[in-house]
């Protein structure tokens, strides 16, 4: 690989990285965060919120408790504790084995109300 091609490739990778950082920062303020869907029919889905710590339990109880269900809008309003992705990563520790659970769904990747309801009995 000649030096011009190598320099072009490095420049391209740096610009690509910077572009992804610019567009990923503060996505909640620009109308919503998105993540890859587990559903093969939809490529992208909007994230309702990032929640960590005690807020996960409170949200789980609100979504899974028997009786009248809260509407999504009411649940988001009650959750005034929504945080950005960088802040939510502080709550997680590295694990040797990859385990997907409600903490990883909602704290690290962000989740929607329907994903929380998947953890109900």
Curated annotation (Swiss-Prot):
<dbReference type="InterPro" id="IPR022353">
    <property type="entry name" value="Insulin_CS"/>
</dbReference>
<keyword id="KW-0119">Carbohydrate metabolism</keyword>
<comment type="function">
    <text>Insulin decreases blood glucose concentration. May have evolved to activate insulin receptors (INSR) in vertebrates. Molecular docking studies reveals unique interaction with the human insulin receptor. In vivo, insulin-like peptide injection reduces blood glucose levels in two models of zebrafish diabetes (streptozotocin- and glucose-induced). Also shorter swimming distance of zebrafish larvae, an effect which is not observed with human insulin.</text>
</comment>
<feature type="propeptide">
    <location>
        <begin position="25"/>
        <end position="45"/>
    </location>
</feature>
<dbReference type="InterPro" id="IPR016179">
    <property type="entry name" value="Insulin-like"/>
</dbReference>
<feature type="disulfide bond">
    <location>
        <begin position="106"/>
        <end position="111"/>
    </location>
</feature>
<dbReference type="Pfam" id="PF00049">
    <property type="entry name" value="Insulin"/>
</dbReference>
<feature type="disulfide bond" description="Interchain (between B and A chains)">
    <location>
        <begin position="52"/>
        <end position="107"/>
    </location>
</feature>
<keyword id="KW-1015">Disulfide bond</keyword>
<keyword id="KW-0313">Glucose metabolism</keyword>
<feature type="signal peptide">
    <location>
        <begin position="1"/>
        <end position="24"/>
    </location>
</feature>
<feature type="propeptide" description="C peptide">
    <location>
        <begin position="69"/>
        <end position="97"/>
    </location>
</feature>
<keyword id="KW-0964">Secreted</keyword>
<dbReference type="InterPro" id="IPR036438">
    <property type="entry name" value="Insulin-like_sf"/>
</dbReference>
<protein>
    <recommendedName>
        <fullName>Insulin-like peptide 01</fullName>
    </recommendedName>
</protein>
<comment type="similarity">
    <text>Belongs to the insulin family.</text>
</comment>
<keyword id="KW-0732">Signal</keyword>
<dbReference type="InterPro" id="IPR016724">
    <property type="entry name" value="Insulin-rel_pep"/>
</dbReference>
<keyword id="KW-0372">Hormone</keyword>
<feature type="disulfide bond" description="Interchain (between B and A chains)">
    <location>
        <begin position="64"/>
        <end position="120"/>
    </location>
</feature>
<dbReference type="InterPro" id="IPR022352">
    <property type="entry name" value="Insulin_family"/>
</dbReference>
